[in-house]
Amino acid sequence: MEFGDGVSFAVVPTVFKREDYKRTKHDTVFSKWQVLIGSNDWEDFKNGKDGVGRYRVQNLPRKSCPGLYELGVAVIGQEQCRKLEPDIVLASYLGQAESVRSRLQRYGRSGAHLRNVNNLNDCETIESPVKAVTGGLFEDIFSKGGSILYRWAPMGSKREAEATEGMLLSTFDYAWNKGSNGERRQLDLLKKLGDREFMSKRKSGISRMLFPFLRNQVGIRIKGEKHVLKEERKLTCDVDEEKSNNFLTSILKLTRSRPQPVSDRFDEVDGSCSDIVCGVLLEDGGCCIRSPVKGRKRCIEHKGQRVCRVSPEKQTPPKSEIFTGQDHHNHKDSDVVCGVILPDMEPCNKRPVPGRKRCEDHKGMRINAFLFLLNQTDREKTVKDEKPDPESHTESIEEEALTRFCEATTKNGLPCTRSSPKGSKRCWQHKEKTSSDTSPVYFQPEAAKNVACGVKLGNGLICERSPVKGRKRCEEHKGMRIT
């Protein structure tokens, strides 16, 4: 600038020391401060402490994109671990990278180019690897109990990040940046980090916390990709919300699993008092109708037991499952019986095993299991022995039609049990066969009333031994088929 006497003066732009200002005009573009390396992370990792890494991977940016980043130092107390205030952070370095996430990872693993600098000896780069370990920038901060923090601002491209970095370096003097700012100021940074009076002045007053426009902001305004930071915050909030929901869910599960008070009293109720009963199946086939203990499903006698079968109505035992062609007046309808049709065409009236439908002799059998073991002669005789009721002639005709069988011999030697259509002796599959084809092959006439094993022997005869109870074959031929 020239004046009247021809004397010119150079206008030197104002350069602010970055660590002296906690609020800047470019704060709106940057993210919040995050811990990159704790004060003891490297030492704990070197000693093999469980669950400790060299740096905080969980605090890195979730997306990899070009941008600016600032490194800062701070002494973090236990009460400040969860929420970091910018008042305690001294910004010390500004950089740019094609991938900010990858650059921060290199800082966390080894300190990158900032670790190989001995700042206590004229800030010169050290060639010896032994001295580099003991005299780096990060180690000096760790010795004072400080931690390394970062914040970043995403940019559209690397060229845009380089241009913005040059603008900020011409406005601020970062203690760790070297070049246009001159030499690194590590000693100055360490002195301010340990100065309690200096750090106390940085804390915001109540008036500035309530009225942000009163805060002293310096520097220049820059542009950045703010939508990337919004997506980052959204992902972080979703993760935090999921963690809090899982924590609340675990608390609710814990409260629900607390034991309920149990009373030793129980009352016997009848069918009209209450619909809630114990329901455990008793040995006599009935169900326990006592009122359960308060807060439980069973009475005091059956606590902890499972229900094999519960009656749908109280004091009403299950209906009997009987397959029979005639009435049985010697049993009540409500009695539970086995119901398997015996060879003499009478149902088994034994009481079933508790929890099952059949008695001990016929367990696992179907109702008409013995019907397949009868030959043609036995079945004809049993059908003829059934005399129809003269008073209900129409019903007897229908029953006779239902009990008419095809009687053709199948490939395995057993008679066909399909019902033949009205006016025909054979079913639809065996209507071409004659009566000679349906003659029994493996039963002797004199053993018509007895159920035999029926397996063909080597000499051409048929085994006529009585089968084992509940099976089709004798003890010697059990599991064999008729060929």
From Swiss-Prot:
Tissue specificity as recorded in UniProt: Expressed in vascular tissues of stems, hypocotyls, leaves and flowers. Expressed in the vascular bundles of xylem in shoot parenchyma cells. Expressed in the remnant cytoplasm of differentiated fiber cells and in protoxylem element of parenchymal cells.
Alphabetized GO MF terms: supercoiled DNA binding
Phenotype on disruption: Reduced levels of lignin in leaves and stems. Reduced seed germination rate.
GIY-YIG domain: residues covered: 64-112
Compositional bias segments (type: Basic and acidic residues): 380-396
GO cellular component entries: cytoplasm; nucleus
Domain of life: Eukaryota
UniProtKB keywords: Cytoplasm, DNA-binding, Nucleus, Repeat, Transcription, Transcription regulation
Pfam families tied to this protein: GIY_YIG_domain
Any one GO biological process: negative regulation of DNA-templated transcription
Cx9Cx9RCx2HK repeats mapped onto the chain: 278-303, 338-363, 406-431, 453-478
Subcellular localization(s) per the UniProt record: Cytoplasm; Nucleus
TM spans (from-to): none
Record text about domains: Contains a bacterial GIY-YIG-like domain which can functionally replace the bacterial GIY-YIG domain in the UVRC protein.
PANTHER family: PROTEIN EFFECTOR OF TRANSCRIPTION 2-RELATED (PTHR35133:SF1)
Function: Transcriptional regulator involved in the regulation of cell differentiation in meristems. Probably regulates the expression of various KNAT genes involved in the maintenance of the cells in an undifferentiated, merismastic state. Plays a role in the regulation of gibberellin 20 oxidase and the gibberellin-regulated protein GASA4. Localizes in the nucleus during the cellular differentiation state and may act via a single strand cutting domain. Transcriptional regulator required for the induction of dormancy during late seed development.
Protein's recorded name: Protein EFFECTOR OF TRANSCRIPTION 2
Organism: Arabidopsis thaliana (Mouse-ear cress)
